[in-house]
Amino acid sequence: MAPKKQNGFMMFVNEWRNRNAEGRRMTLAEAVYHCGTIWEKMDTQQRGPYNSDAKDANAARRDKRGSLNGHGQVDKAQREAAESLMDKAQREAAESLMDMKRTTERLVLNAKMSHDLENAKFVFVAFNYFTKALTTDVYVPAEFAACEYSLKEGIRSIYSTMIDPGQIIFGQGSDALHNSSTTHDLPLPPNALGEKNMVKLYRNILDYLTKCQGEGKTPIVFTPAENIGMVKSCFRYLECEDDSRDGGGKIEVFDIQYLLFILKKEVMSVAGLNDEKINKFATDAFFKNDFFEFTAGIACQISSINTRDYHVATLIGLLPAQTINVYLGSTLRSMHEVLSDNDTKLTGYISFLFEVICGVALMFWVLQKARKELSETLLSADYNNEGKHPDVQV
């Protein structure tokens, strides 16, 4: 079936949705209904630019189709143009990957050169979502969690919140119900729990990241490689509601598995150990082994009641921190011995093993206490009311 031609009215609808936060919250059908009354009141002069844009779009689409030669093949020039676009996309992806690696390496190396690697702070994040659009990478977020981590202290602070987007993507109620029932088991909109104001929520997240990383810095967070696309999409979902932002200061999402690889190499370097056998394939394999899957008492009360411990966003955000502790434990102890012998500034490890055990125990206690307080508040409330759920910050 040939694609439908553009018309001036739909050009107006699309522009109105892009420019208004109210429009971005509407489905296409709702936006068409709303804009219909506005379009009827517009005169020919006001409609002119939109009708002209529609004609230009139709003409551009006809030109893009191009023509076939006598053998039914695409013209050589068109094929080369398409290949050029593919090459450009591949180059941009490669450049983005290299930029991520360079930035991660710079963060770790700067801390190492300033003799403060053990106190360097990193933020790990995780999202749960209700559903994903069928043809685009748009995710509707359901829950967010972040934790601040350092080699010396382990988990330093936790931020978590449930999210009520108000509605899910039109026609995907069944998909959202299936995803929820098989993962986080959170109630769907319009009965969802948590923060309803996306602008407030996004600014609260930025405030937490600024508190962790300092003023005037681009916020950088880490998440497992397979979740990077989903996490970026959820941040865009929250950010697009904020009309006051000019697009600056976006949150950068990096690969936590590459961070683990660089940390392992640099810690071994400080400890004077041979790191020639360390490679990313080995660290990735270790990271994907879940050593805490059957650990009891580390999820919130609601998740425990619903037998959904493994999918709660807070737990997803905390597991990488514990994995790094396990993987780097012996190497960090060796680094401490070398630094103690050389009388350097890194003298914080009196007994690293004891600190790790105490840190993990303290983390479990703090997490359980915070989530228990949250669950008691939620369980005492009626799930059919507005479900206002305050952010939780530990």
Curated annotation (Swiss-Prot):
Belongs to the maelstrom family. GO terms for molecular function: transcription cis-regulatory region binding. Keywords: Cytoplasm, Developmental protein, Differentiation, DNA-binding, Meiosis, Nucleus, Oogenesis, Repressor, RNA-mediated gene silencing, Transcription, Transcription regulation. Residues 2-69 bind DNA. Its main location: cytoplasm. It is found in: Cytoplasm; Nucleus. GO terms for biological process: germ-line stem cell population maintenance; male meiotic nuclear division; negative regulation of DNA-templated transcription; oogenesis; piRNA processing; regulation of miRNA-mediated gene silencing; regulatory ncRNA-mediated gene silencing; spermatogenesis. SUPFAM superfamilies: HMG-box. GO terms for cellular component: cytoplasm; nucleus; P granule; perinuclear region of cytoplasm. Involved both in the piRNA and miRNA metabolic processes. As a component of the meiotic nuage, plays a central role during oogenesis by repressing transposable elements and preventing their mobilization, which is essential for the germline integrity. Repression of transposable elements is mediated via the piRNA metabolic process, which mediates the repression of transposable elements during meiosis by forming complexes composed of piRNAs and Piwi proteins and governs the repression of transposons. Residues 44-93 are annotated as: Disordered. Residues 73-93 have a biased composition (Basic and acidic residues). InterPro entries: HMG_box_dom_sf (IPR036910), Maelstrom (IPR024970), Protein_maelstrom (IPR039259). This is Protein maelstrom.
